[in-house]
Amino acid sequence: MSDGWSDSESAAKAKTGFGSGGGFGGGNNGGSGFGGGKNGGTGFGGGNTGGSGFGGGNTGGSGFGGGKTGGSGFGGGNTCGSGFGGGSTGGSPYGGASSGFGGSTATSGFGSGEKSSAFGGSGGFGGSATGFGSGGGSFGGGNSGFGEGGHGGGERNNNCFNCQQPGHRSSDCPEPRKEREPRVCYNCQQPGHTSRECTEERKPREGRTGGFGGGAGFGNNGGNDGFGGDGGFGGGEERGPMKCFNCKGEGHRSAECPEPPRGCFNCGEQGHRSNECPNPAKPREGVEGEGPKATYVPVEDNMEDVFNMQKISEGLMFNKFFDAEVKLTSSEKTVGIKPCKTFAEANLTETMQKNVAHAGYSKTTPIQQYALPLVHQGYDIMACAQTGSGKTAAFLLPIMTRLIDDNNLNTAGEGGCYPRCIILTPTRELADQIYNEGRKFAYQTMMEIKPVYGGLAVGYNKGQIEKGATIIVGTVGRIKHFCEEGTIKLDKCRFFVLDEADRMIDAMGFGTDIETIVNYDSMPRKENRQTLMFSATFPDSVQEAARAFLRENYVMIAIDKIGAANKCVLQEFERCERSEKKDKLLELLGIDIDSYTTEKSAEVYTKKTMVFVSQRAMADTLASILSSAQVPAITIHGAREQRERSEALRQFRNGSKPVLIATAVAERGLDIKGVDHVINYDMPDNIDDYIHRIGRTGRVGNSGRATSFISEDCSLLSELVGVLADAQQIVPDWMQGAAGGNYGASGFGSSVPTQVPQDEEGW
């Protein structure tokens, strides 16, 4: 380039900048720059007269630390100068004669010289093929540069260590694992063991902290010598002796500590770490533990959009719901119940009847036929029914009908929020969905239903419910918070509902918080309130725990076999190892794996697909891969802000992003119109979560498809065989063999025992 930083002609004309007046390489007349002025200029640490700067002046200059005249220092002057790069006669400790650091002539130096060398030449800061701290010819570029501890600055390379692509870590890399060189001990440099296992005497570590230039110094060649070496510009200290993390003593690591181990950070007890602690997580002290405050204020959809958004027409397989066996059990010998075959028999108000019809409901499903009259008669209920069978309406409609009939509503005259019904959900998205479902049924009535969940701006959320809310639906943490501060008053609560109850009771933390809520002094005891629990899965252990919240004469409603999969969903399985998953996914979506292109007529553009993964980073990685293949994809997971999560669901619902890549936050309860295909890129940890995931398709009798990637170490194979059999679907031969305990000839080529792999919502 003709106007490089070190070009002598440009440097003479410029007023500021690297190598110009007032700039990083010195000025022309009296300029104060990083390299001193031409006459009388002061630079980085310069003096008063004769200009002593970081690059020295032209006359009588002295460098970094030099004297007033003729001194020697960092980039000495024209005469008798010496220092960092030396002057014309003063030797060449760094960079050779006549090439001082900001040197004496236009030949070369800090801010001058030829294009091919010098500060800012074609090769970068310092000339040659590489520049100042450059990883590949740029100022601070690549993995090292100007200012980074250890390398001299620049941005750190965060690409995958395995494939060198951005957006994920090597542990999440979908590419085949590359061979690595054998690792050696950090202490003795011998292979076969790590430094903590090393039997050699521990070697002291070299200093690594400091400032400008980092541990590898400005201009050094790998050691700790050089400009800014051993701590950088301004120096640093050598690292002190290693201390044990457990006892803070010197001379050993925590793994070798003779003192008793420190207790769990959460509860203080020994024997486990905080991430394994069975006790509820304690709030962290200080600003750092509080996290950023939520600022999201949602824009509510108008009612016509709400009615249309979640209106799913009955599919051709709708009658399959009515083939299921219905089983009622109770401590009472007989339960006097007449199923309501139509909504006209459900004792709904005239306005609610119209709203139900407007919402697209025409015929009651089995869970609705039995739950509607049982709730109306005042029974506590534990209900289990297939995904997509209308459980939300089964508890909302009778609750709202009874409250309206009794004129038992939270009004402004009560002076605060006295809800008659509390509905708890495991995720924010499900809470928002139930809220909108309730808005439909309560349309043009006097009933107010409000959402309360994390991610919403606290002030906004509080202001909404202080106006009064007969029904509150939300997540446990935020509701508990408002109860504790007195915003939500539970004195008049008549109904307590747990949706996805098995997850609410079984998940660590949820159960304890639920107990806290029901045990508040203001909360009516279970004998004086009605408790309802609904889910598509209800393991025996959870049923046992759930009984503590229910009255003795509660009714258990089981539609078909407890925990059975939706029969409207065709379940398929792809045998593949981890390294093969990415290509399998691309093939399923109609993407050419060689060219990363997609035909415009591909179904992926017209049908909605949900892809479930276990890790947030993998969700973002796959979305990036699909987007590069011109497939509109978006993610939803716990690390995204609520504004982003809500927008992701909105775009998926309206079809502008036909592929949604999700973690566990989207596996339960979400009722999204037009989801044709669910792909389990990563299998869940348990069979119940599998049932819920595939239940995002096949809603209200519409046919759906679920494809799961099964690897050799999947622990769910035997349970999957049972799920397929219960759903009256064909079990592949290789899965039958695997369910017996060995994969055999029909499995993965050898007899390998099934291995259980080792092991997401705040408010």
UniProtKB/Swiss-Prot annotation:
Residues 18-30, 209-230 have a biased composition (Gly residues). Residues 592-739 form the Helicase C-terminal domain. It comes from the Eukaryota. The keyword Phosphoprotein applies. Disulfide bonds: none annotated. Keywords: ATP-binding, Cytoplasm, Helicase, Hydrolase, Metal-binding, Nucleotide-binding, Phosphoprotein, Repeat, RNA-binding, Zinc, Zinc-finger. ATP binds at A385, Q386, T387, G388, S389, G390, K391, T392. Sequence repeats lie at residues 24-33, 34-43, 44-53, 54-63, 64-73, 74-83, 84-93. Probable ATP-binding RNA helicase. May act redundantly with the P-granule component glh-4 to regulate the formation of the granular structure of P-granules in embryos. Plays a role in positively regulating the localization of pgl-1 to P-granules. May play a role in transgenerational epigenetic inheritance. May protect somatic cells from excessive apoptosis during normal development. PANTHER family: ATP-DEPENDENT RNA HELICASE DBP3 (PTHR47958). This is ATP-dependent RNA helicase glh-1. It comes from Caenorhabditis elegans. The lineage of its organism: Eukaryota, Metazoa, Ecdysozoa, Nematoda, Chromadorea. The gene is glh-1.
